[in-house]
């Protein structure tokens, strides 16, 4: 069986760090929304027993890549729980990468979630999305949001999701050619991890902010300059722990107009936000 799909990017419309847990992880509150832009996937299920990842330049089998980790985790769990009868289940996964790494757009997490959701279908392991999201949490905090496939306010360590409907808008997303490690940002001495936790109603009525933005502006001058430049045209802020910055527009034409006047060396794209993940729209016909 073959399945071709989009592994979508996301933006964080707001992101607050509300405390540090005893286990060292941080609690967050974030508004997580999908874009109709992302990496291109083609997954071919087979009975070779192997998980193979093909990119435009390399073939991977035994590497610490989120796609291979997700596929092997699903297979191992399904075998232990009797949802797969033998170890012959395998897959060839072809990836065309469009989402920059370390950009705050969730590329690695999206890839892991896409792998879990699609192989669950192709291998007929019959896990619910909730069950897959719990598996995904073992890979990364953003993975459950991608697995569930709805715009959501996400809390805790990524394990508490409140699906909502958010107005779909157009975004100009600009990449400053800087890769920022999530771990690096969470360990920053400048991180104030005590933003007051708010109710869902208050969160959605309060002007949106990102607790990591001031840290990024202090440590990465290009991000500071980029936010200043884009904010002169439209409401703009950083997504995730960086490095991408997005500007918000009511229509595509307005986004294109601003993109056209930016310096020619600026890298970016225009995308529409969507309340249902493009993956889930095609896979589940939502």
Curated annotation (Swiss-Prot):
Active site positions, chain numbering: 10, 142
Which PANTHER family does the entry mention? 4-DIPHOSPHOCYTIDYL-2-C-METHYL-D-ERYTHRITOL KINASE, CHLOROPLASTIC
Recorded hits in InterPro entries, A to Z, give: GHMP_kinase_C_dom, GHMP_kinase_C_sf, GHMP_kinase_N_dom, IspE, Ribosomal_Su5_D2-typ_SF, Ribsml_uS5_D2-typ_fold_subgr
Its pathway is: Isoprenoid biosynthesis; isopentenyl diphosphate biosynthesis via DXP pathway; isopentenyl diphosphate from 1-deoxy-D-xylulose 5-phosphate: step 3/6
Enzyme class label? transferase
| Regions annotated as coiled coil | none
Q: Which family does it belong to?
A: Belongs to the GHMP kinase family. IspE subfamily.
Query: What top-level branch of life does the organism fall under?
Result: Bacteria
Native source species: Buchnera aphidicola subsp. Acyrthosiphon pisum (strain APS) (Acyrthosiphon pisum symbiotic bacterium)
What EC number(s) has UniProt assigned to this enzyme? 2.7.1.148
Known catalytic reactions: 4-CDP-2-C-methyl-D-erythritol + ATP = 4-CDP-2-C-methyl-D-erythritol 2-phosphate + ADP + H(+)
NCBIfam families in alphabetical order: ispE
Q: How does it assemble?
A: Homodimer.
Q: What does this protein do?
A: Catalyzes the phosphorylation of the position 2 hydroxy group of 4-diphosphocytidyl-2C-methyl-D-erythritol.
Q: Which residues bind ATP?
A: 100-110
Any one Pfam family match given in the protein's UniProt record, by short name: GHMP_kinases_N
Its Gene Ontology molecular function terms?
Answer: 4-(cytidine 5'-diphospho)-2-C-methyl-D-erythritol kinase activity; ATP binding
Q: Name one GO biological process term.
A: isopentenyl diphosphate biosynthetic process, methylerythritol 4-phosphate pathway
Q: What is this protein called?
A: 4-diphosphocytidyl-2-C-methyl-D-erythritol kinase
> Which keywords belong to this entry?
ATP-binding, Isoprene biosynthesis, Kinase, Nucleotide-binding, Transferase
């Amino acid at each position: 069986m073959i399945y071709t799909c989009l592994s979508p990017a996301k933006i964080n419309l707001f992101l607050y760090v509300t405390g540090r847990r005893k286990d060292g992880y941080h609690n967050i509150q974030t508004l997580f929304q999908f874009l109709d832009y992302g990496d291109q996937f083609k997954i071919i299920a087979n009975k070779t027993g192997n998980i193979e990842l093909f990119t435009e330049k390399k073939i991977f089998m035994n590497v610490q890549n989120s796609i291979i980790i997700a596929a092997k985790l699903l297979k191992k769990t399904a075998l232990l729980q009797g949802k797969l009868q033998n170890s012959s289940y395998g897959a060839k996964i072809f990836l065309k990468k469009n989402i920059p790494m370390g950009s705050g757009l969730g590329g690695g997490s999206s890839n892991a979630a896409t792998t879990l959701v699609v192989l669950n279908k192709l291998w007929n392991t019959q896990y619910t999305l909730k069950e897959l999201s719990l598996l995904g949490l073992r890979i990364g905090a953003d993975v459950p949001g991608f697995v569930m496939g709805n715009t959501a306010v996400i809390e805790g360590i990524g394990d508490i999701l409140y699906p909502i409907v958010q107005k779909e808008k157009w975004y100009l997303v600009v990449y400053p050619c800087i890769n920022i490690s999530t771990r690096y940002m969470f360990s920053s001495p400048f991180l104030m991890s005590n933003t007051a936790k708010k109710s869902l109603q208050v969160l959605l009525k309060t002007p949106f902010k990102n607790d990591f933005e001031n840290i990024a502006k202090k440590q990465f001058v290009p991000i500071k300059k980029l936010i200043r430049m884009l904010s002169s045209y439209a409401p703009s802020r950083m997504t995730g722990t960086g490095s991408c910055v997005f500007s918000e527009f009511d229509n595509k034409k307005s986004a294109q107009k601003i993109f056209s006047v930016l310096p020619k060396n600026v890298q970016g794209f225009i995308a529409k936000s969507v309340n249902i993940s493009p993956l889930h729209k095609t896979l589940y016909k939502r």
